[in-house]
UniProtKB/Swiss-Prot annotation:
Expressed in leaf petioles. The lineage of its organism: Eukaryota, Viridiplantae, Streptophyta, Embryophyta, Tracheophyta. SMART domains: S_TKc. Induction: By infection with an avirulent isolate of Phytophthora brassicae. Disulfide bonds: none annotated. This is L-type lectin-domain containing receptor kinase I.9. Disruption phenotype: No visible phenotype under normal growth conditions, but mutant plants (e.g. lecrk-I.9-1 and lecrk-I.9-2) are defective in extracellular ATP-induced calcium response and susceptible to an avirulent isolate of the oomycetes Phytophthora brassicae and Phytophthora capsici. Impaired increase of cytoplasmic calcium concentration in response to extracellular ATP. It is an enzyme of class 2 (transferase). Its main location: membrane. Residues 22-289 are extracellular. It is found in: Cell membrane. It comes from Arabidopsis thaliana (Mouse-ear cress). The gene is LECRK19. Essential receptor for extracellular ATP. Binds ATP with high affinity through its extracellular legume-lectin like region. Is required for ATP-induced intracellular calcium response, mitogen-activated protein kinase 3 (MPK3) and MPK6 activation and ATP-induced gene expression. May play a variety of roles in stress resistance. May be involved in protein-protein interactions with RGD motif-containing proteins as potential ligands. Plays probably a structural and signaling role at the plant cell surfaces. Involved in resistance response to the pathogenic oomycetes Phytophthora infestans and Phytophthora capsici. Residues 1-21 form the signal peptide. One of its GO terms (cellular component) is plasma membrane.
Length: 766
């Protein structure tokens, strides 16, 4: 039994000896080269000079260094300790310093959960102020953080479980000689002494420059019960932490002494301290090169700036003449449009039309705009164009795209209008990626565009001819209401006058046959609107060459469906049959009526609006009426004259009365081969397209000037076209333009006049 008790005593004494060897009451680091008792973490390293570097000049770092052995505090008496260390905070040139250095007393050396920057490498947002987090820290902080109640960017504080200091003061020391506190710049890069003393329940903190003795008055003195803060006082670790953020610096510990007895701290020997490294700018030698280099650089910079200035000036250059001053209120600067469209970038590109590219833009006032860039080769007609653009700006109608103004550069015009968020109508008709418009939406668009054209023809101060009515020029606003836009070809003339233009411009399929000989008129707009109505209803383009012959031309195809009493078969299949049949038939018939090749048989836009709103019944006509369902394409390059090979006969009203047509005119044609082509410079195109095979002799019924007069029937065999007669016909039309302009005095449509002249030439040849 005694032997067994002796063994227990021996083992216990060995265990106590082991614990005593692992715990210490004091230590000193005159150099940190002996790393046996050091615990280093994160960016903390020991330099060859013996300096302990906690952080280097890198962003968002933190470093920890602890004495590896726990401190042996008394388990019964009051807790006390003293520590004295020398540190240096060296900022990187041109940067603010890091977040500072902290002396730490903690039951653990593990701070992997901590955050850098303002949390100093020992705290984080979740542990901030937690009573279960047992940490005492003395901070030398060089960043002002109002969230943590910092007083400035150069202070010393006492932290308990939180980065919010329980005691804080600007870095300074008490001078007995001056009897006042002298400030210290923590980021001076010079070594600074720090003393931390705790006895009883009072914690004192002092700082001073390296050459100054410990001040007689501490900088901070605050009561703290460390017995409550550290219930397990037998296992506490002392060390340092440092952190950086976007503010960076090198943070060093040069020397460190610690003891649980205040009087047993080892004295500092300044002569043995390692030198603190300071980053310095490279030494510059004064030489001729150094003197000339700034001069050369200055000249180069001036040259570059001058080049950029002239390039920028040329980039935003505009053309402005004296006559444009009256239009200044409607003119945009190119600079503002360039910035609004982000330099006409691809991201703002909306599309490309026949007259230019369109871009989306945002003005500084928040207004969205569409900018069309139109090229022109000279100044001829520009003044008239600008004047008409400004006049268009005065047009006010809910179904017109508002035109805000213009900008003019060399060989370029820019038209500024309101941006329509839902794009153009043709995208919703032909693009499967776009949502399908219902019939009710399409009818609203048709009615709106009809109202807009009526306004342009009769409601404005001058008659406005749009000259390019088609689905791609119809824009849809946020509510999918139709807005007529793209006035790039519009022309003005006084009410009761004629449009001062003879140029045949427009889009193939929408151009009235008389456009090339008579020029633009309200009737040519009506024709294009008729094609547009059929386009919206049928969901197809006016001419689609890839289809079968009978379906190739929309106008003819719709008329053929009407002849077969199957008009609804021509409707857009994407509607899925969801429409009002009466409305669809009315719109289709009205489209055929408006696209009649006989101009006098077309309604006015005022009548069209009344028809669409059911305020006026449609006139009595059929698919066999003269000019209904006949497609007469117009070739606008005027390089040849084309007439179909056919024979014609003239008769009086007695023949027309037996015809199913209710119009006094009947024009039948054949699907015979097209007439031969003769090349003549600046000649006009007259194209007659046959409808279906028939005998060589066909008939044209003309109105009689006198109901009592008798007209003999003139018949002939098929006569082949002859180049000479075509040339003569062209020469007659060019030499006697009054035939086109005064044809109405003869009571005959101009097409009949042209065909009659041709056949009279043929008969004369025979």
């Amino acid at each position: 039994m005694a032997r067994w008790l002796l063994q227990i005593l021996i083992i216990s004494s060995l265990h106590l000896s082991s614990v005593s060897s692992q715990q210490e009451t004091s230590f000193v680091y005159e150099s940190f080269l002996d790393r046996q008792n050091l615990y280093l973490d994160k960016s903390a390293i020991v330099l060859p000079s013996g300096l302990l570097q906690l952080t280097n000049a890198s962003e968002h770092q933190m470093g920890h260094a602890f004495h590896k052995k726990p401190i042996e505090f008394s388990s019964s008496g009051p807790l006390s300790f003293s520590t004295h260390f020398v540190c240096a905070l060296v900022p990187k040139p041109g940067f603010e310093g890091g977040h500072g250095i902290v002396f730490v007393l903690s039951p653990s050396m593990d701070f992997t959960h901590a955050e850098s920057t303002r949390y100093l490498g020992i705290f984080n947002a979740s542990t901030n102020g937690s009573s279960s987090y047992h940490v005492l820290a003395v901070e030398l902080d060089t960043i002002w953080n109002p969230d943590f109640k910092d007083i400035d960017h150069n202070h010393v504080g006492i932290d308990v479980n939180s980065p919010i200091s329980v005691a804080i003061a600007s870095a300074s020391y008490y001078s007995d000689m001056k009897g006042s506190n002298e400030s210290i710049n923590l980021l001076s890069g010079n070594p600074i002494q720090v003393w931390v003393d705790y006895e009883g329940t009072l914690l004192n903190v002092s700082v001073a420059p390296l050459e100054v003795q410990k001040p007689t008055r501490p900088l901070l003195s605050h009561p703290i019960n460390l017995t409550e803060l550290f219930p397990n006082r037998s296992s506490l670790f002392a060390g340092f932490s440092a952190a950086t953020g976007t503010a960076i610096s090198d943070q060093y510990i040069l020397w460190w002494s610690f003891s649980i007895d205040r009087g047993s701290l080892q004295r500092l020997d300044i002569s043995k301290l390692p030198e603190v490294p300071h980053p310095r700018a490279p030494h510059k030698k004064v030489s001729t090169l150094i003197i000339l280099l700034p001069v050369c650089l200055a000249i180069l910079v001036l040259a570059v700036l001058a080049g950029l200035y002239f390039r920028r000036r040329r980039k935003y250059s505009e053309v402005s003449e004296t006559w444009e001053k009256e239009f200044d209120a409607h003119r945009f600067s190119y600079r503002s449009l360039f910035k609004a469209t982000k330099g006409f970038s691809k991201d703002e590109f909306l599309g490309k039309g026949g007259f230019g590219e369109v871009y989306r833009g945002n003005l500084p006032q928040g207004r969205e705009i569409a900018v069309k860039r139109v090229s022109h080769n000279g100044d001829e007609g520009v003044k008239q164009f600008v004047a008409e653009v400004v006049s268009m700006r005065c047009l006010k109608h809910r179904n017109l795209v508002p035109l805000f103004g213009y900008c003019r550069r060399k060989r370029e015009l820019l038209l500024v209008s309101e941006y329509m968020p839902n794009g153009s109508l043709d995208e919703h008709l032909f693009d499967d990626q776009k949502p399908v418009l219902s019939w009710s939406q399409r009818l609203v668009v048709v009615k709106g565009i009809a109202s807009a054209l009526w306004y342009l023809h009769t409601g404005a101060d001058q008659v406005v001819l749009h000259r390019d009515v088609k689905a791609s020029n119809i824009m849809l606003d946020a509510e999918f209401h139709g807005r007529l836009g793209d006035f790039g070809m519009a022309r003005f003339h006084e009410h009761g006058g004629n449009a001062a233009t003879t140029a045949a411009v427009g889009t193939v399929g929408y151009m009235a046959p008389e456009l090339i000989t008579m020029g633009a008129s309200t009737g040519t707009d009506v024709y294009a609107f008729g094609v547009f109505m059929l386009e919206v209803t049928c969901g197809r383009r006016p001419v689609e060459p890839q289809l079968q012959v009978e379906k190739r031309h929309m106008i003819k195809w719709v008329c053929e469906c009407w002849k077969k009493d199957s008009l609804l078969d021509a409707t857009d299949p994407r509607l899925g049959g969801k429409f009002v049949a009466e409305e669809v038939e009315m719109v289709m018939k009205l489209g055929l009526l408006c696209s009649n090749i006989v101009p006098e048989s077309r309604p006015t836009m005022e009548q069209v609006v009344l028809y669409l709103n059911k305020n006026l019944p449609l006139p009595d006509f059929s698919p066999y009426t003269l000019g209904i369902g006949t497609f007469a394409p117009v070739l606008v390059d005027a390089s040849s004259l084309v007439v179909s090979s056919a024979s014609w006969s003239l008769s009086g009203p007695s023949m027309s009365s037996s015809s199913p047509n209710h119009s006094p005119y009947a024009w039948q044609s054949t699907d015979q081969p097209w007439g031969q082509t003769i090349d003549t410079k600046n000649s006009l195109h007259i194209v007659a397209e046959p409808e279906k095979p028939s005998p060589a002799v066909k008939m044209v019924t003309l109105p009689a000037e006198d109901p009592q007069s008798n007209h003999s029937s003139i018949s002939s065999q098929r006569v082949q076209p002859v180049k000479r007669e075509k040339r003569r016909l062209h020469q007659i039309l060019v030499a006697f333009p009054w035939i086109n302009k005064q044809y109405f005095k003869l009571g005959l449509p101009k097409h009949i006049v042209h065909v009659s002249l041709f056949f009279f030439l043929q008969l004369a040849r025979l």
